[in-house]
Each structure stands twice: as C-alpha cells, then as structure tokens.
Amino acid sequence: MKHVFSKKRAYLLLIAVAANLGVASAEDFESGGIHYTTTTTDGSPSATVIKGSDAYSGDVVIPATVEFNGGTRKVTAISAEAFNGCIHLKSVTIGSNVISIGFKAFYGCEELEEIDIPANVKTIGYNNAYTSHPSETFVGCTSLRKVTLGSVTSMGKSVFEGCTNIVTVILGEGCTVIGNNCFKDCAKIKTIEVPNSVKSIEEKAFENCTALTTLTIGDGVTSIGVEAFKGCFHLRTATLGSALQTIGHSAFEGCEDLEGIVLPDELTTLDYDHGYTSHPSETFKGCISLESVTLGKKLANMGSDVFLDCTALKNVTINEGCSIIGNGCFNGCTKIAGINIPNTVVTIGEKAFFGCTALKTINVPASVTSIGSSAFQNCTALTKATIGNGVTTIGNQAFQECTHLTTATLGSDVRSIGFKAFYGCEELEEIVLPDELTTLDYDHGYTSHPSETFKNCKSLVSVTLGKKLANMGRDAFMDCTSLKNVTIKEGCTIIGYGCFKGCVKIAGLTIPNTVEIIDAEAFYGCTALTAIDIPESVTNIGGMAFMGCTNLTKATIGDGVITLDYQAFKDCIKLESVHIGSEVKTIGHQAFMNCTSLAEINLTDRIATFDYDHGYTSHPSETFKNCTSLTTIVLGKRVTAMGTGVFADCTGLKSVDIHDGCELIGKSCFSGCTSLESVEIPASVTSIEAQAFYGCTGMLKAIVGDGVVTIEEKAFMDCSKLESITLGSELRTIGFSAFRNCVALTEVVIPDYVTTLDYDHSYTSHPSNTFTNCAALKRVTLGKRISSMGAEVFSKCNNLQQIIIKDGCKVIGSKCFDGCSNTKTIINNCVELPETAANAFSNYTAALYVPAEALATYKATEPWSKFGTISTIEGGVPEPTTDKCATPTVTFAGGELIFACETEGAEFVYEITNADVKKGSDSRVKLDCTYQVTVYAKKDGIENSETVNYKLDLLKMVGDANGDGVIDAADIVTIVNIIKTAE
C-alpha cells in the first residue's frame, strides 16, 4: 500500500515541531530553484528542502548553506516527499550539512540512476511521529543502479525496496544499521559487503535479492533479522562476522545455492524474534546445496527446523556448548551419514533427525536426558543406535520405521518409551529394557492412543522386560512375528491390551505372580503357544486375550481370576483341557467358542454369569458355542441365567446338569446339540427362551420343571428324536413352532395353567405351528385355561388319533388340526362351547364325544356339527386302535439304494450322510467311502415304523461298481451310468 504524505501535512508537522521548541513559525522560501522551509537545528537557524510547486528535474545540487532574509542557514534536512514523483530527476548532490532524509523523499524518481548519501547523513526514513510507517525513501526509483551509504545510524523501513535495477551497493564504514526491507526485492544486487561499523541487519533487509551470490558480513554485526536473506536463491558464499550473536528465523531460508556456512563462536541464537514466539526457526530451511555446517561454541539452543530439508547437507560439526538440538533441526537432511553429538547436549528435540535416510549410526551421549518424539523416525539406513545412561525419556515414534536398525542399546536410566518408538524396525533382533523403565506408553497428549512401541518389529526374537515396568502398554509388541523368547520380570502388573497380539512364534511364556491383569487381545493370534499357566495374582483376563491361539492345548487359570472376559479363548481349536480357578465369577460371551477339541471343563460354583460384557449388551453369549468335543456339562450353583447360545452347536454334548437355582435358559442356549439325549429342567427355571434346544436331533426325552412359565418360539423345534416331553404345572405360554417337526413325539399334555399357544408379539401375522408336523403324535390333551391360540397349532400331525379337550378351554384356533387326517376320536369336555375357528378341523370322520348336557348345542353349531358321529362322553368312549408301518428293508444294487416295506402304500423318510465329510485337525484322514443311512416308513392313519440304520461301504472291492462281489463287464456299465448321471 502506498502512503501519500502531502506538502500541507509536512508543513503542519514542521510547525508543530517549531511550536514545541518555542521558536517562530516556519517560513517557506525559494533559492536557486530549490524550495525550503525555515527550521532550527541545535539552536541555530537552518533550512529544510521541501517539495516545490513544480517538479524538480535534471541535476539537482543541494548546497551546504542557503541565504534567507540577509542571513545564512545550514541546509540540514530533506523533508518527507520532497522529490516524490519527480520522474525526470537525473541526479542529486546532497550537501555536507544534511543529516536526515525524510520518508518517500525520492519516491518514484524513475530516471534517478545513482545516489551517494554522504557520511553527514545519519537518518533515512520516518520521523518519531511515524515509527511504524514504511520510509519507502527511494521506492519506485526504477533506474537506480548504484547506491552509496555513508554513516547512516537510523534507517526506516523499505528505503530501497523494489529498486530492481540496483547492481552495486557500497556501505560506508560509518554506517551502523541496514533497515527493515531496505533492499528487499532488489533482484540485481550481486555482492554485498557489510562493514564492521554495522551493528544490525534488520528484518527482510535483503529478502529476494535473487542475483546475490556473495555476502560478507563484518565483525561488528551482532544480529541478523528475521528473513534477512530469505529467497536469495543464488547466494553461494556467506561469510559471517565474529561478533554475530543472533540470527532470526528464516534468515537464509531458500538460499538454494549456498554451499557452506560457519557459524561464529559468539552466536547464541538461531531462532525467531520475540514477536514470533511460536514460529519455527527455519534459519537455513531449504538450502538444498548446503553441504557443510560448523556450529559455534556458544550456540546452546539450535532452534526448530533450522536446517529443515537441506538435502545436500553431509558434514555437520556441533561444538561443545550446544545443549539443545531443536525440534526438526535436521529434518529431511537426507545425506547426513554420521554426526557426533557432543556430551554437552541435554535434549534432542522432536523430529530433530526425522527422515535422515543416510544416517547409519547414532551414539547418544550420557549428557542427553530426553530424545524427542520422532527424533530419528524414518532414518531408514540407521543400523545401530546406542543410547547413553543419562537418557530418561525416549519420545513417541522416536525410531519409528528405522527399517534397517538391527541393534538398539538402551541406557540404564531410561524410564519412559513413548508410543510407536520402535514401530516398524523390521530388522531389530533383540531388545533389553532397563530395570528403571516404568512406561511403554503414549504421552499424556495421546491418552487414547495405543502404545505400539515395538509393533511390527518382524525380526525381533528376544525381549527382556525390566523390573519396574508395571504396565506394558497397548499393542507394545504386536505383530512381532519372529518373537520367541519373552522374559517378564516380577514387578509387572499389567500385560497390556494387544501386547503380544500376532506374535506367532511365542511357544511358551512364564507370567510372574505380580501380574494382576491380562488385558484384552494380549496374546491374540499367538499360534505357536501350546500351554499357559495363569498365576493366582491375576484377577482379570481381558476379552480375546488368547483368541486364535490355534496350538494351545492346555490352560490353567489361577484361583485369583474373577473375570474371564469375552472371547478370551475363542478359536483355540486344539485346546483340550482348561482348569478354571475357584474364584471365577464371570465368563464372557464367546469365551470358548469354536474350541473344537475341548473335551471337559470344570464350571465352579462361584460362576454366576455366562454372558456378554457391558460393552456388548445386545451381543449373544455363545460362551461354549461349537465346542464339538465337549460331552458333559455340570453347571455351578450360582448360575442364574444362561445367555444366548451358550452351548449352541456343541454336537458332542450328551448330558447337561442344570442345578436348582438357575432361572433362565437363554435363546439358542443348546441349539444344534445333536448328541444331547435328554434334559431335565429344574423348578427354579422360569423361562426357556427362543430356540433354546432347536435342532437337538438326538434328544429323546425332556422334562420341563414346574417353575417354567414360558416356553418361547422354536424352543424344541426340529428335535426329531424327541419321544417324550413332560410340561410343568405352572406353564402359561408356549410360543410359535416350539415343538415343530418333533416327528418322534407321541403324546402331548398341555398343562391346565397354559393360556396361550401362540406367536410372540414380534410376529403377530405369523401362524403358531406350535406342534406342526409332529408326525408320530397320537394323543393331545388341551388344558382348562387356553384362551389364546394361533393358527395351525397341531397342523400336519397326520398320525394324531385322539384329541382330548378339557372343560374350560376357551378357544381353538384357525387350522388348529389341519391335515390331521387320521384322527379317530375327539373328546371335548367343554360344557360351554369354546370359540372355534371355522377351519379348525379338516377331518370330520372322527367320532366326537361331548358332555350330554351340551350335545344339542354341538350338533347345532359349526364346525362341530360337521362331524358325522357326535356322541356323549357319558355313553362311553372306546380306546383307539393302533396300527404301525412295517419296518423297512434297505438293499444296494446297480449303484442304487432300494427301500422296501410290507405295508402297502407306505412312504419312506430317509437321511443319507457321507462319512467322508469330516471335521478335525489330524494331519492324515482315511477316506473310506462309507455312507450312513437312516430310514423309516410312514402311512396316513397308522403309526410310523421303527427307524432303521444302514451302513453302506461303497466300492470296498476295487472295481466292483455294482456291489455284487464280482468284477466283470457289468461293473463297467455301472460306472459309465454313474458318470452320465453326474454329468
């Protein structure tokens, strides 16, 4: 922005100054073509050159003195804007008495080619009233080529800024200051020699002097200001004076051709000025040709990002006296191969050597107490790091991704190692953590951040942990895939979250008896671990702590453990034996899920919960789901509720002992337990939840205790061998499909307190199907209080022969007995007719027996009136006759199974299982081409036959395709037919 300072304003300032000095008002006059105003200097009459009514042009000579009113006055000043806009001014000779030149004095003098400011001039620029105002004294002098400064001691801002044709600058020995922005953007200056008299080179004095190649700074200069030489791209040589004490931030930033720099011993600061307290130093940032740096003896703090991205820097000499290597000091200096850190250094700052990709070794002396975050991160050539005994703190990510680091020796006093400190050091083979170390963790600024201190150190084989390391931190050794030997010393109390997760070669580990917590995922996926002994000191085993330890065969859980959290041993497929300590109270959801080799487990009396943790309130329990080798379960006395799917798909489970005290059998609790033969539910249980015994195809008998109030939907569905069910006296609700497809069930007695045979409220449009397709069911007794009945409750029970309805039953629902084609007698004891759906029955050939007093009503009311025979109960009810299908036979010939039965018109229901479809973990499996066949015969109106089991050994004789015991041409025909069928 250009500031216009008018002649009138200049006069007002001169008048104000005169008034303050108690002198007469100034008078303007003209002499020799130059305009003046009267002033007083040091008590003597003087004159100041001012702007005339016409622009000055040509060659102007300002005399030493001028005559006015008969007296002689010294010409002591050139006022502000005196020659402003004099575009045809060629030259100016300044008189010997001029001591000051005002701001914008020669602004826009486009033809002025040279200016020689004599030694008598002390001030160029602003006056005291405008100390922050840019001087711009020669701004816009676009033809100016040569400048000579004599003994200037005070200089305002931007005196020669933007004079793009200045080539030569001569600074006199009396000059003491080079002001802010003085030669900024003077793009043709090639050399600068600063004399010894100069004390200060101020902010941006030579910024963007892009042609500058050589700089010599005299021994008198004590400070170089902020960005003083920033952007001098072609500066090749810079010689700094011996008295230099301070260099401001970014002073030489972007000097891309600068090759070397020697910082004098008196230098104490490479930093920002106080106006930029949060600004990085960046003093030599981006000096991409800089190869050599020597730092002075008194430079204690090197400042932040001082040599950032000096990509050619090879040789760095840090003299003793340096105490701080600042944040990012050598960040991105990709050619530093080695550096000697003197034993005066106390702190290595954050990112001090970040990305020094040529650095091979580092020796941190004992004087250093702190290594900052990311100090050596991404030093990919670093092979060896020795950390002195004085270091107490290694910051976050200090050596992260030092991918070739093979040896790291830690000093004895290291107390804290930050998160990801050695993350990704893929060639690090061994680490010994000192006994003083207390923390492998994040700093307080990252309280939720995982430690990951040695994560992904893929070559790490051996780790020894110190005595004072109480908390090992989260994910500290995660994915150290070569780690075999771990020594945890007494003193450790917490094995952190994910600490050894993915360490696939840890085969054994001793956990000391000081450990109290094994946190979540601590040993997740340690696939070589074969046994674990958890001491009594441990109180909590976290979620997924040993999940996926696929070779773990034995686990002993100490008596101090109270909580065994979610998925703690999930997918430990070879785990055969688990001893659970006497104090365990809670086993979390899926804690032993998919432990397919687990044959036995001791569930102690203190265990109260098989459930999810509080973080997964909607998650199924599934604690022992798919433990296919588990044969027997005895529940402890304090288990009050078994959560969802606790023993689901335990296909080898044959018996379960549910103690009196358990109140809830959860959803899908025993679903898919195909070997479970019987279950007795004690009176303490009040609810059997949905699908609790769904698909227990081996169950023969179930006794439901008198305390059970609710059996939810599908609770015993597909229990295909269930022959007998005893329902407790307090039962009130049976949910939809509760006993659907229980094809072996022969009789059902609905207790008198049952009010509902129905769907739950989530399925209001769903048919009940409570006993649908119970193909062997012969007799049904409906209780006294049934008031709600959904559709199709006993549909497709095609062998149902007798229905007994007790007096008090209020309703018989839609299609209740639909498809019950073989019903012979219905004994309805209801004096008051139940509300009966029009389609409740599909077979009206059965004999209906009703109370004598209601006989007429039944005969007059549909659908009861549709029955062909309606008699009174008092007249006697005959016992139903029972016929049964003959037992089927099974033969194999011509590549086919052939079923036969003596009962005419019988159908066959069979199931064929190929025994070659196997699950296991053995290294060798014999394929025997064996098929297991189960079959029974059925026919409407009579009882199903007995079930036949048939074993077929196919092709036992090699080549005997048709199974006739002889290998001949007939076998070839059979094989061809089999192939054609397959195609």
What do the PLM-derived regions correspond to, one by one?
Residues 11-20:
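Bacterial N-terminal signal peptides
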Residues 33, 55-77, 87-100, 110-126, ...:
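Structural signature of tandem-repeat unit edges
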Residues 961-983:
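Alpha-helical segments with a strong preference for the paired helices of cellulosomal dockerin domains
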Residues 79-82, 103-107, 135-139, 156-161, ...:
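Consensus positions within tandem repeat domains that build extended binding/scaffold surfaces
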Residues 24-28:
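Boundary at the C-terminal end of the N-terminal hydrophobic targeting segment
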Residues 876-957:
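Short, compositionally stereotyped local motifs that mark structural "simplifiers"
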Residues 2-12:
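Bacterial N-terminal signal peptides that target proteins for export
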